[in-house]
Amino acid sequence: MGQLGVGRTGKTAVLDIELRRSGSRTIISRQYSEVPLQVQRALYPDAGLPGMAHVYVLSPSGGLLQGDRYKTSISLKDKAAAHVTTQGASRIYGMNSNCAIHKMDISAGKGCYLEYIPDQVIPYAKSRYFQEVRLAIDDDAAAVYSEVVTPGRVAMGESFLYDILCTSVRCENQDGSLRFAENARAEPRRMNLRGEAVLGGYSVHGTVYVMAPPESARTIEYTAGRIISHTDGILGGTSLLPGGAGITARLLSHRTDSIFKCIEGIAGACRMEMTGAAYPGIRKC
């Protein structure tokens, strides 16, 4: 497979956006991007939270190739409120050398509210993908961050045929104190990912992290547990994060839409608790 050299235009993508409150709305106050990552202007489709900015991360490339290096930075300040999602799934194409890497820095300052709910990752056969996420969430802010990973292009007969998929999430507060950290590595050619101690026969897995003050986190966890137990085709559970300043939810299913139904429900529980507004669902542009 031929490829451009690492660092060439189109191989190194950058997206850096800052959101602040301006009057009654959250606006994109700073924006810098290098193809293929880019964003549209902020939209305001939610009648329940008319000042919340909805931001859609776009990529005309269709997926990540070997040697791709992506860097995303999203920062919320001055009591900003934003819902950030992607235009579609992150497709990780097959590789015969090298790997694809995506590093993300996401921060929410005091009084801010963020929902970061991207579409699923689809690792193609022989792909290698590394994702590193650093969260900086103020103790007086609230944020939802989710990840969903599928087994591959199932319709093409590819299921758990990728080489390696590694994810790392680390969250700190405004003082740099660790809130939680987690690393995961999947190598289906070396591991039995369908085993009872891993995915238990399921094929799609999702994780949701909710960062919120302890008194709100307990309420959100209770509601999230009920949502999981009442969603068909889902095996999952919740737990409080260290120090009680948030929750994590683990989700397993055979269907991606069932996972996202749970994620939206949990995001809705957080939004209702923190803002008093209902969650209308993810709206794609």
From Swiss-Prot:
Cellular localisation: Cytoplasm
A single Gene Ontology CC term: cytoplasm
HAMAP family in alphabetical order: UreD
Full protein name: Urease accessory protein UreD
Annotated keywords: Chaperone, Cytoplasm, Nickel insertion
InterPro entries (UniProt xref): UreD
Family: Belongs to the UreD family.
Function of the molecule: Required for maturation of urease via the functional incorporation of the urease nickel metallocenter.
GO molecular function annotations of the record: nickel cation binding
Gene coding for it: ureD
Keyword Chaperone (UniProt): yes
Superkingdom as given in the UniProt entry: Archaea
